[in-house]
Protein backbone atom coordinates (compact mmCIF):
# COMPACT_ATOMS: atom_id res chain seq x y z
CA UNK A 1 0.00 0.00 0.00
CA UNK A 2 1.49 3.32 -1.09
CA UNK A 3 1.78 6.14 1.39
CA UNK A 4 -0.43 9.12 0.77
CA UNK A 5 1.36 12.15 -0.64
CA UNK A 6 2.23 14.90 1.78
CA UNK A 7 0.13 18.03 1.82
CA UNK A 8 1.66 21.33 0.74
CA UNK A 9 2.11 22.37 4.38
CA UNK A 10 3.67 19.03 5.33
CA UNK A 11 6.11 19.34 2.42
CA UNK A 12 6.97 22.88 3.51
CA UNK A 13 7.76 21.75 7.06
CA UNK A 14 9.84 18.88 5.73
CA UNK A 15 11.77 21.34 3.53
CA UNK A 16 12.52 23.60 6.51
CA UNK A 17 13.90 20.63 8.47
CA UNK A 18 15.81 19.13 5.54
CA UNK A 19 17.39 22.48 4.69
CA UNK A 20 18.71 22.83 8.24
CA UNK A 21 20.35 19.40 8.21
CA UNK A 22 21.70 19.80 4.67
CA UNK A 23 23.64 22.89 5.69
CA UNK A 24 24.49 21.65 9.21
CA UNK A 25 26.31 18.62 7.81
CA UNK A 26 28.83 20.64 5.82
CA UNK A 27 31.39 21.12 8.60
CA UNK A 28 31.91 20.36 12.27
CA UNK A 29 28.92 19.16 14.25
CA UNK A 30 26.15 17.60 12.20
CA UNK A 31 23.29 18.79 14.41
CA UNK A 32 24.00 22.52 14.41
CA UNK A 33 24.89 25.35 12.06
CA UNK A 34 28.30 26.97 12.35
CA UNK A 35 28.66 30.66 11.53
CA UNK A 36 29.79 29.78 8.00
CA UNK A 37 26.97 27.27 7.50
CA UNK A 38 24.44 29.82 8.72
CA UNK A 39 25.75 32.47 6.33
CA UNK A 40 25.69 30.01 3.43
CA UNK A 41 22.13 28.91 4.24
CA UNK A 42 20.90 32.50 4.44
CA UNK A 43 22.74 33.56 1.28
CA UNK A 44 21.50 30.60 -0.77
CA UNK A 45 18.05 29.94 0.67
CA UNK A 46 16.82 33.23 2.19
CA UNK A 47 18.30 36.00 0.02
CA UNK A 48 15.01 37.89 -0.33
CA UNK A 49 13.66 37.50 3.19
CA UNK A 50 16.90 38.50 4.92
CA UNK A 51 18.23 41.09 2.49
CA UNK A 52 17.66 43.94 4.97
CA UNK A 53 19.01 42.17 8.03
CA UNK A 54 22.28 44.11 8.12
CA UNK A 55 25.03 42.01 9.66
CA UNK A 56 24.58 38.24 9.46
CA UNK A 57 27.01 37.93 12.37
CA UNK A 58 24.71 40.06 14.52
CA UNK A 59 21.65 38.11 13.38
CA UNK A 60 23.34 34.85 14.31
CA UNK A 61 24.28 36.22 17.73
CA UNK A 62 20.68 37.27 18.34
CA UNK A 63 19.44 33.76 17.50
CA UNK A 64 22.20 31.92 19.39
CA UNK A 65 20.47 31.71 22.76
CA UNK A 66 23.23 29.78 24.55
CA UNK A 67 26.01 31.84 22.86
CA UNK A 68 28.00 28.78 21.68
CA UNK A 69 28.56 30.23 18.18
CA UNK A 70 26.36 27.52 16.67
CA UNK A 71 22.66 27.35 15.93
CA UNK A 72 20.85 24.25 17.12
CA UNK A 73 17.58 23.40 15.42
CA UNK A 74 15.48 25.19 18.06
CA UNK A 75 17.54 28.37 17.56
CA UNK A 76 17.18 28.06 13.77
CA UNK A 77 13.43 27.61 14.31
CA UNK A 78 13.36 31.03 16.00
CA UNK A 79 14.57 32.50 12.70
CA UNK A 80 11.84 30.67 10.79
CA UNK A 81 9.28 32.01 13.27
CA UNK A 82 10.56 35.58 12.90
CA UNK A 83 10.39 35.32 9.11
CA UNK A 84 6.89 33.86 9.23
CA UNK A 85 5.74 36.75 11.44
CA UNK A 86 7.17 39.29 8.99
CA UNK A 87 5.42 37.59 6.06
CA UNK A 88 2.16 37.59 8.02
CA UNK A 89 2.51 41.31 8.75
CA UNK A 90 3.04 42.08 5.07
CA UNK A 91 0.03 39.98 4.06
CA UNK A 92 -2.06 41.62 6.77
CA UNK A 93 -1.15 45.07 5.43
CA UNK A 94 -2.14 44.04 1.91
CA UNK A 95 -5.50 42.77 3.17
CA UNK A 96 -6.16 46.00 5.09
CA UNK A 97 -5.40 48.11 2.01
CA UNK A 98 -8.11 46.35 0.00
From Swiss-Prot:
Q: Does the keyword Secreted apply?
A: yes
Q: Which residues bind Ca(2+) 1?
A: 32, 37
Please state where this protein is localized.
Cytoplasm; Secreted
Entry GO CC: cytoplasm; cytosol; extracellular region; extracellular space; nucleolus; nucleoplasm; nucleus; perinuclear region of cytoplasm
From the UniProt record, list the coiled-coil ranges. none
Q: Where mainly found? A: cytoplasm
Q: What InterPro entries does the record tag this protein with? A: EF-hand-dom_pair (IPR011992), S100_Ca-bd_sub (IPR013787)
Q: Name one GO molecular function term.
A: fibroblast growth factor binding
* Record has Cell inner membrane as a keyword: no
Q: Which residues carry this modification: Phosphoserine?
A: 32
Q: Name one Pfam family in it.
A: S_100
Which terms does the UniProt entry file under GO BP?
A: mast cell degranulation; positive regulation of canonical NF-kappaB signal transduction; positive regulation of cytokine production; positive regulation of interleukin-1 alpha production; protein transport
Provide the disulphide bond pattern.
Answer: none
Going by the UniProt record, its keywords in alphabetical order are: Calcium, Copper, Cytoplasm, Lipid-binding, Metal-binding, Phosphoprotein, Protein transport, Repeat, Secreted, Transport
Q: Its function?
A: Plays a role in the export of proteins that lack a signal peptide and are secreted by an alternative pathway. Binds two calcium ions per subunit. Binds one copper ion. Binding of one copper ion does not interfere with calcium binding. Required for the copper-dependent stress-induced export of IL1A and FGF1. The calcium-free protein binds to lipid vesicles containing phosphatidylserine, but not to vesicles containing phosphatidylcholine.
Recorded protein name is: Protein S100-A13
Amino acid sequence: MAAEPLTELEESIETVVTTFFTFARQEGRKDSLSVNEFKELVTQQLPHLLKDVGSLDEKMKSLDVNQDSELKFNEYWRLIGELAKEIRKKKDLKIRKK
